[in-house]
């Protein structure tokens, strides 16, 4: 339990004891102690007096006063308690208790902020899962940045996480890919009689694949149509996936599993899933098609599994895939999907309910659109016309760190304008530069201290830390583990980037307010330990969102 949680726990116990002592309630509701946004309202605050109004049948301020009158504050380092507004109880603490976070950070190093105990919960996190039909674009980039950061945060919070990419390599889009490659293949051989499919792919990468195959395997022109299509399907997927994997790896995004949709057909998983749903009585025939009774489970209508022509809908392999995820021993499934998948949420949840699986075990996060902005003008993108701004181009334009950080800064369910010019600025206006500069500045201070013979020590006299800005900085360091926990529980990586900005800001304010290296040897040792704790925290926080922490800039 981290320092903040210990204080909260102690305060809750003392508030509970006070309520019992004052005979305000027999069944005491949940007591919440929070950190106020405005420090003028104390270090911690609770609204329990207002919660108890109906039970105690008294004015909330009277209830608050009764709680305060019977409160033992000695165990929680409380130096002052006041009542504010309609009945908030605000606690002001002797902030020396916060200094315990300094040796904790120094001693734990890279593990600082991480949960000490496993939650014994298996999470399968599926993200990106772009069709292997072209380059990754800005929407995929956001999905990748958020997904990878979320995986890191969940692991730090004590969850067992499997990162998975679902390869859509069995649908009509792969046939269109193969036909598109075929057209470019014959064009490279001087044959323009093969028309591009209406839903074909016109990107430069398809032209390159066709030319490469024509150069290396011109004999494929003599294959039967069926054999050539089968070959181009596999070669196209392999080519696109190799490129996609490299782009993601360069973006510092890695997966534990690459799950092929085709495998669901080959190993009989789809047939077995259909048989199971039929056995359970949730399928029926109508209008020549096979349907699933998803409306029994809060979907707005039933869904087709097998069309009139005997082919599967996209929903069928998706159902088999999610049932497979559950059968692999995962407690929670998290899917990050594009904005165009909003209608999929209820039907996928309903499909799991048919197997007796609690649909709450499936969490689907819809990723909203990103607009690339340059000089105040939107940079348009169109994947199939070959004009898309790719992940590779974004990395080359602004750098991996800036791209990762910017794409994680906002809640994934909100639209986001990515300012390309701001991402490249070397100024305090650029969030990633501001955060990384704080880390580099600390490294410079530590180097200077070492040259003066001052080493980092975890047992300095921290009572010398009294400056208001230093205390604010300590509070931010102490909030690191609770922030990780909050970001994990709410599946919200942007909470961590917000925290990084606040921590960097708190450090810069401290640096501008007080000298780190002073004439007082003991105070200097304490300051050096403090800024090293900040360095460790910044390094670990940046790592969780896939960003480097440079030692110089």
UniProtKB/Swiss-Prot annotation:
<dbReference type="GO" id="GO:0004814">
    <property type="term" value="F:arginine-tRNA ligase activity"/>
</dbReference>
<comment type="subunit">
    <text>Monomer.</text>
</comment>
<dbReference type="InterPro" id="IPR009080">
    <property type="entry name" value="tRNAsynth_Ia_anticodon-bd"/>
</dbReference>
<feature type="short sequence motif" description="'HIGH' region">
    <location>
        <begin position="130"/>
        <end position="140"/>
    </location>
</feature>
<dbReference type="InterPro" id="IPR008909">
    <property type="entry name" value="DALR_anticod-bd"/>
</dbReference>
<keyword id="KW-0030">Aminoacyl-tRNA synthetase</keyword>
<dbReference type="InterPro" id="IPR014729">
    <property type="entry name" value="Rossmann-like_a/b/a_fold"/>
</dbReference>
<dbReference type="GO" id="GO:0006420">
    <property type="term" value="P:arginyl-tRNA aminoacylation"/>
</dbReference>
<dbReference type="Pfam" id="PF00750">
    <property type="entry name" value="tRNA-synt_1d"/>
</dbReference>
<protein>
    <recommendedName>
        <fullName>Arginine--tRNA ligase</fullName>
        <ecNumber>6.1.1.19</ecNumber>
    </recommendedName>
</protein>
<dbReference type="InterPro" id="IPR005148">
    <property type="entry name" value="Arg-tRNA-synth_N"/>
</dbReference>
<keyword id="KW-0963">Cytoplasm</keyword>
<dbReference type="InterPro" id="IPR036695">
    <property type="entry name" value="Arg-tRNA-synth_N_sf"/>
</dbReference>
<comment type="similarity">
    <text>Belongs to the class-I aminoacyl-tRNA synthetase family.</text>
</comment>
<dbReference type="InterPro" id="IPR001412">
    <property type="entry name" value="aa-tRNA-synth_I_CS"/>
</dbReference>
<keyword id="KW-0436">Ligase</keyword>
<keyword id="KW-0067">ATP-binding</keyword>
<dbReference type="InterPro" id="IPR035684">
    <property type="entry name" value="ArgRS_core"/>
</dbReference>
<dbReference type="Pfam" id="PF03485">
    <property type="entry name" value="Arg_tRNA_synt_N"/>
</dbReference>
<dbReference type="GO" id="GO:0005524">
    <property type="term" value="F:ATP binding"/>
</dbReference>
<keyword id="KW-0547">Nucleotide-binding</keyword>
<dbReference type="InterPro" id="IPR001278">
    <property type="entry name" value="Arg-tRNA-ligase"/>
</dbReference>
<dbReference type="Pfam" id="PF05746">
    <property type="entry name" value="DALR_1"/>
</dbReference>
<keyword id="KW-0648">Protein biosynthesis</keyword>
<dbReference type="GO" id="GO:0005737">
    <property type="term" value="C:cytoplasm"/>
</dbReference>
